[in-house]
Amino acid sequence: MSHIVKIYDTCIGCTQCVRACPLDVLEMVPWNGCKANQMASAPRTEDCVGCKRCETACPTDFLSIRVYLSSETTRSMGLSY
């Protein structure tokens, strides 16, 4: 089941989210928008299980990475209205 993984331009290129992901959904790609000259990318969102470990690992005040669970997942967890 695929979830939406959104990476914002507040990414500081620290690699914490990449290292936290148990399924290697994320990887770092070149980007000139921060000192690290890299940012997270999510090329394999079809493998995302929605554990949100990447969100938990993100050290920025505004989470630079967010996982939006699919509607099927939110229904099964009783989170939908």
Swiss-Prot record:
Domain of life: Eukaryota
Residues holding [4Fe-4S] cluster 2: 21, 48, 51, 54
Function: Apoprotein for the two 4Fe-4S centers FA and FB of photosystem I (PSI); essential for photochemical activity. FB is the terminal electron acceptor of PSI, donating electrons to ferredoxin. The C-terminus interacts with PsaA/B/D and helps assemble the protein into the PSI complex. Required for binding of PsaD and PsaE to PSI. PSI is a plastocyanin/cytochrome c6-ferredoxin oxidoreductase, converting photonic excitation into a charge separation, which transfers an electron from the donor P700 chlorophyll pair to the spectroscopically characterized acceptors A0, A1, FX, FA and FB in turn.
Keyword Cell inner membrane: no
Entry's localization field: Plastid, Chloroplast thylakoid membrane
Listed GO biological process terms: photosynthetic electron transport in photosystem I
Cofactor(s) the record lists: [4Fe-4S] cluster
Alphabetical list of InterPro entries matching this protein: 4Fe4S_Fe-S-bd, 4Fe4S_Fe_S_CS, PSI_iron-sulfur_center, PSI_PsaC
Pfam families (alphabetical): Fer4_7
Domain annotation 4Fe-4S ferredoxin-type: ranges: 2-31, 39-68
Keyword match ATP-binding: no
Disulfide bond residue pairs: none
Cofactor note: Binds 2 [4Fe-4S] clusters. Cluster 2 is most probably the spectroscopically characterized electron acceptor FA and cluster 1 is most probably FB.
Family matches, as PANTHER family: PHOTOSYSTEM I IRON-SULFUR CENTER, PHOTOSYSTEM I IRON-SULFUR CENTER-RELATED
Record-listed E.C. numbers: 1.97.1.12
GO cellular component: chloroplast thylakoid membrane; photosystem I
Catalytic activity: reduced [plastocyanin] + hnu + oxidized [2Fe-2S]-[ferredoxin] = oxidized [plastocyanin] + reduced [2Fe-2S]-[ferredoxin]
Record-level Gene Ontology MF annotations: 4 iron, 4 sulfur cluster binding; electron transfer activity; metal ion binding; oxidoreductase activity
Binding site for [4Fe-4S] cluster 1: 11, 14, 17, 58
Keyword vocabulary terms for this entry: 4Fe-4S, Chloroplast, Electron transport, Iron, Iron-sulfur, Membrane, Metal-binding, Oxidoreductase, Photosynthesis, Photosystem I, Plastid, Repeat, Thylakoid, Transport
Protein name (database record): Photosystem I iron-sulfur center
SUBUNIT field: The eukaryotic PSI reaction center is composed of at least 11 subunits.
Membrane topology per record: Peripheral membrane protein
